[in-house]
């Protein structure tokens, strides 16, 4: 029985032949490309939801095709993060972390997620001064985003960065101060008085700290080690 990867490949080849034979306009080519990208993405998501390792490897093969087909910057970011998620599902955390860099460099240089990623990476590689520089920049980026009304994402990221650095009291104070300023906000109340968000941050911190990077870095391979 033909697997997902082969089916999608056949679909792509057939569509390409039709495009050449009919001589489509640039707009038609773009629309067909977008349609194929959506179908690939839907197939990948279905395979990922199974949690089955063999199907996730099929999904990675489709993800390769998707990255080649759709080169729009913001879409590439999503596809790389999709790839990162699959490597985490396979238990290959170090590979996932390395691949994440390909997504992070697609973000603006002053993006707090990007800055935090490179802070953690430099810390893991023993580049303490660089790590501290990036952590500081990431926190400043969070502050700037909050000043411009970025919402809770920047707030949670700031708390998570401080927590990762071992500054747990400061992390809690970030949330508590925000709640004191907006006591009618139920989400902030839940974060300030409950443990849910902190359980998530603790789990994320421990997972990230457990990742060990090797030099030279591992390659983005879909083959089992």
Q: What is each residue range found by the language model?
A:
Residues 1-22:
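Sec-dependent bacterial lipoprotein signal peptides
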Residues 22-75:
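N-terminal leader/linker segments that initiate helical-solenoid repeat arrays
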Residues 35-36, 55, 74-78, 110, ...:
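Structural signature of alpha-solenoid helical repeat junctions
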Residues 59, 63-66, 103, 138, ...:
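Alpha-helical solenoid scaffolds that mediate protein-protein interactions
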Residues 77-155:
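Alpha-helical adaptor scaffolds
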Residues 89, 124, 164, 197-201:
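Register position in tetratricopeptide repeats
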Residues 168-225:
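Terminal, low-structured helical/coil segments at or just beyond the last alpha-helical repeat
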């Amino acid at each position: 029985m033909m697997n997902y990867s082969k089916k999608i490949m056949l679909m792509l080849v057939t569509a390409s032949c039709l495009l050449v034979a009919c001589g489509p306009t640039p707009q038609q080519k773009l629309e067909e490309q977008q349609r194929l990208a959506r179908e690939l993405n839907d197939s990948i998501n279905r395979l990922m939801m199974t949690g089955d390792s063999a199907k996730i490897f099929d999904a990675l093969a489709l993800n390769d095709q998707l990255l080649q087909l759709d080169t729009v910057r913001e879409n590439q970011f999503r596809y790389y993060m999709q790839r990162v998620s699959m490597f985490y599902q396979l238990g290959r955390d170090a590979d996932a972390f390395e691949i994440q860099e390909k997504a992070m460099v697609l973000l603006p240089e002053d993006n707090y997620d990007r800055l935090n990623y490179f802070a953690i990476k430099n810390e893991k590689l023993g580049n303490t001064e660089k790590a501290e520089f990036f952590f500081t920049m990431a926190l400043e980026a969070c502050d700037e985003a909050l000043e411009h009304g970025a919402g809770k994402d920047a707030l949670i990221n700031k708390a998570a960065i401080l927590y990762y650095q071992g500054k747990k009291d400061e992390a809690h104070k970030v949330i508590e101060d925000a709640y004191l300023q907006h006591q009618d906000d139920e989400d902030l109340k839940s974060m300030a008085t409950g443990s849910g968000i902190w359980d998530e941050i603790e789990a994320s911190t421990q997972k990230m700290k457990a990742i060990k990077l090797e030099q030279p870095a591992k390659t983005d391979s879909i083959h089992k080690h």
